Amino acid sequence: MAKKKTSTTLTDQARERLKELGYKRIVEDFPLFDPLGDGSMNATAELAALDGDEPVILFASAARGEAAKAPVQDDAKFRAGLGAAKGKPFRFVWVWDSDNDFFFDLEKDAQIPSLPTGAKWRSAARPISDSRTRLVQEVSAEYHRGDFRTIQRKFDELHEAIYSRGGVKPTNAAIDELGKLLFLKVHLEKSSGYTLSTGLAKGKRFSDIYSAEYVRKRGKAAIPELKDAFREINNLAQYRAKDITGEEHTIFSYDEPLRLENPEILALAIEALELRDRDGNPIRLSVPDRELLGNGRRSRVLRSHLIHEDLLGWAFDVFLRGKYASDEGLATYLTPSQVVDCMARMSFGDIAESDLWARRGDKDQRERWNPKGGAEASLPAFLCGDICCGTGRFLVGALREMKRRILDDKHVGHSDDDKLKWLSLMKQHSLFGSDQAIGSIQKARINMLLYGEDHTQLLKVDDSLTDTHIDRLAGKFDLLLTNPPFGSGKYEDPKGLARMRREDLGLGLGWSWPAGDRSRRKELSKADPAGLFIDRNLQLLKPGGSLLIVLPDGILSNSSDAYIREYIMGTKDPETGEFLGGKAVVRAVVSLTERTFSLAGTDAKTSFIYIRKKRHPADPQTPIFFALAEHVGYLTRGKSELPDPEGNDLVDIAANYLAGPKEIK
């Protein structure tokens, strides 16, 4: 048996590899910067490659098979964020466990395929803005003070306790209970002095009853008090938002109760969410967007006890993927974050800054939005959505990209206040999601809440294909990202299929026909919903809008589905090779391994396609970007997720697309 490589051996090997890349100054146990200035960090880099005084690469070793794990990678990335001095975080991160290499670009907050050489790192690294530098260093300090590698483990333990001993089943209901407790914790931080005005705890400060000590002291008597408190807080005006129907909704249904009945489990849950730093000081879960700019006037105490939203959101995302039961609606398969990130990065990379900052009253936007009055005219014109949103994973991915773009320092024409106001408006008006499962909508609201948004337009519908409220958004979306339900013959609603034949509404895939001969079309009595959702999403896009959609490979290759491909691209002229007709231009096709959705219970072979709705019927089909993702970052063994030693091809795929030739871009 081969002797297991030690961390020291890996460090020595890493030093040699860095030398081969041309780095001359390589320091072991490199002392990292303390942004708080109080000596509390006491953090070091196992190995640091520098160019003069400029920190370039931070290396971190890991035990065999551990390098692919998010907590290990996060620890290295946040160490790199501390950097060598004020304003000097490391630019790149390398995590290695002797079998697996993982490289990250700190400015892009993204995985990269390789490390740059010592001679070329400056050209490979984009300049880091001042506000981004402040953010990276402060967030890194927060991470190391709080040791947030424990958050996801706590979520797992809480779910098990709520499910097995708290009397809350099935598993999705247990997830809802955890979401409710997170919601109450966020409210406590936003309104620490809140006094209850109704229920059994009327007149008491919420902070007094939402504590493990109080619950243990009061026992079962505390349960109805907290149930009443949850009902009151859930219905506060600050957590209400009007959807496109004009109806108000709250984070949870207005009459949804807190279901935990076991006081010991409730106390345990409250205690577990009382996150503290190494000095025992409380850490906040909620982060105002101003803090993301890094230019708020904050005391050292406030600065040191913030938790960045990405840390909590990451933990909840990992937890949700591992626990969510896929038994609601037509099909509920949680899209892995690796796929979401790839699709979001590719699509937002093609969105112009002018589109993100456009107003509905702008000359080139008025026809699309037809605003009524000045207030409506001043709203963002950009609209992104997912009409099969499930737990909101694509909406979270879009929100992350929006924040990254809007808060970027390169917008020299916009003040910090302008950016914050605009981002706030975009959160309310630029994201839309719908789903037929109310449980999924509730989880989407929690997912968005943990990423800093509690007013997203999320709509419970009976059928996203036929919903009349969604009809009002036809022609308005800039971008749709989605993973719809699929399965041959799974959609059988006669009214829905009849509606998908309404050519006056721009719909036509309620028919099928032999490829090349639409005159022989026939009505479908049942259909794969994936094909129908292509049509519905195209209807919702503005001319020139983009759709990125996960599809079963049959739609892309089966002869019986050739009419769908023809509907999208048109028919190919045998003489010119050009496609005639068709509703869209295909930009990219990315084939996914059959393991991609295996944790969700299916090994179906899938791909995602990136198509752009034609602005004019004569728009030509341009060269298509094709890619194959044989590895998506993980393997599965039963219900467990294991790191893929071959890494994540989707990282390279997104980077290659964004760096592609102009005729593809």
Language model: regions and residue ranges:
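Class I SAM-dependent transferase core
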Residues: 314-349
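Short acidic loop-to-beta-strand element that houses the catalytic metal-binding Asp/Glu
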Residues: 35-51, 609
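Active-site beta-strand-loop-beta-strand hairpin of nuclease catalytic cores
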Residues: 45-58, 110
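Conserved S-adenosyl-L-methionine
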Residues: 336-482, 487-494, 498, 552-554, ...
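Charged, often flexible domain-edge or linker segments that flank or initiate folded functional domains
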Residues: 57-61, 67-68, 77-78, 83-246, ...
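Long recognition/docking surfaces used for binding and targeting
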Residues: 183, 190-324
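Acidic-basic catalytic patches of nuclease active cores, encompassing PD-(D/E)XK
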Residues: 1-38, 536, 572
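A conserved structural/catalytic subdomain of Rossmann-like adenosyl-cofactor enzymes
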Residues: 65-67, 119-121, 125, 129, ...
